[in-house]
Amino acid sequence: MTGEEWGLTVLSFLVRVGFFLFGIYQDANFKVRYTDIDYFVFHDAAKYVYEGKSPYARDTYRYTPLLSWLLVPNHYFGWFHLGKVIFVIFDLVTGLIIMKLLNQAISRKRALILESIWLLNPMVITISTRGNAESVLCCLIMFTLFFLQKSRYTLAGILYGLSIHFKIYPIIYCIPIAIFIYYNKRNQGPRTQLTSLLNIGLSTLTTLLGCGWAMYKIYGYEFLDQAYLYHLYRTDHRHNFSVWNMLLYLDSANKENGESNLSRYAFVPQLLLVLVTGCLEWWNPTFDNLLRVLFVQTFAFVTYNKVCTSQYFVWYLIFLPFYLSRTHIGWKKGLLMATLWVGTQGIWLSQGYYLEFEGKNVFYPGLFIASVLFFVTNVWLLGQFITDIKIPTQPTVSNKKNN
């Protein structure tokens, strides 16, 4: 690690400390809390675990029990904010892995700028210091890719299986990862290709099923229903960025049981898109391109998801530095794209403010139109990303080593 990278790491740590301390101050002195509402759910679920009970005794806890186990120290040491410190550590480690992978592909100066997109990103910092657990998943995914690049497929598979156990969505990465491994080992013969694929596949499956079986043995069907099955029929009535939100809300309002039939089919266009974008790795089956494909694939997944909040943006922001390291998009067009992405968010947030803090009924047309604008913008951005990723790039040192 160079002096500049040490400086960036220290600065990013200090900024997070500042956000963390300000959050504690805001919680104590302002009506609007800094702490994420989900953190209270994690904290309460951890209390039940600490008392020898099920985390699902806490209403609205819809996650793996491992997450509640992670916050048990909150109650052991008697400090409410300790879990946030844990999430910030995962956040920083994620940034360090990004730094490691970027340094193998581009110049140090450019890498330093791109690393800052994660390490000094106020959105990323806010999400982890507010007590959102996305940094844990991001760290697991980055470690998966780190060991994948080194061809340590068993370890990569274990971490990948753990990632899917934490949240289902990383399973979409299996297609581009399989394509990368298949082509990465093409010079070593079909037997090596098959062995490598079986290695990561079996280690992933064993870890995923092992974690699932262990949690099922401890917490029973409640674990399966709350951690996994719930998300298949989920209809989130709370306002969020998704264009599906209003449609699902209106559809469920017409049903006696409050469930939406539309919710069952909302994932179809999303599934088709992630399958197609995942196959973009065939276009250029290198490790650098794999990281770019994962960005595009995750962007498509979040854009078409039936629930979309700011924390979901972190899912693809971990790949943004890698995408930008090989992009052909000029700075003027890039600035326009960023402005549209931020601007349409701002329009939606203004409507959300009127609804949540002023109690105004802006569901329609205000909030709905804002969601449509954000969705259309993201669809256009997705098209630009796909077009850009199909342009051939020169192989880097890291790709030559892999091949």
Swiss-Prot record:
Domain of life: Eukaryota
Enzyme Commission no: 2.4.1.-
Localization per Swiss-Prot or TrEMBL: Endoplasmic reticulum membrane
Enzymatic class: transferase
A GO biological-process term: protein mannosylation
Transmembrane segments annotated in the record for this chain: 5-25, 79-99, 111-131, 133-149, 161-181, 194-214, 267-287, 311-331, 335-355, 362-382
Protein's pathway: Glycolipid biosynthesis; glycosylphosphatidylinositol-anchor biosynthesis
InterPro entries assigned to the protein according to its UniProt record, in alphabetical order: PIG-M (IPR007704)
Record keywords, A-Z: Cell wall biogenesis/degradation, Endoplasmic reticulum, Glycosyltransferase, GPI-anchor biosynthesis, Membrane, Transferase, Transmembrane, Transmembrane helix
Lumenal domain ranges by topology: 26-78, 132, 182-193, 288-310, 356-361
MF terms in GO: alpha-1,4-mannosyltransferase activity; glycolipid mannosyltransferase activity
Segments on the Cytoplasmic face: 1-4, 100-110, 150-160, 215-266, 332-334, 383-403
A single Gene Ontology CC term: endoplasmic reticulum
Membrane topology: Multi-pass membrane protein
Known role: Mannosyltransferase involved in glycosylphosphatidylinositol-anchor biosynthesis. Transfers the first alpha-1,4-mannose to GlcN-acyl-PI during GPI precursor assembly. Required for cell wall integrity.
Family the UniProt entry places it in: Belongs to the PIGM family.
Name recorded for this polypeptide: GPI mannosyltransferase 1
Organism whose genome encodes this protein: Saccharomyces cerevisiae (strain ATCC 204508 / S288c)
Encoding gene, per UniProt annotation: GPI14
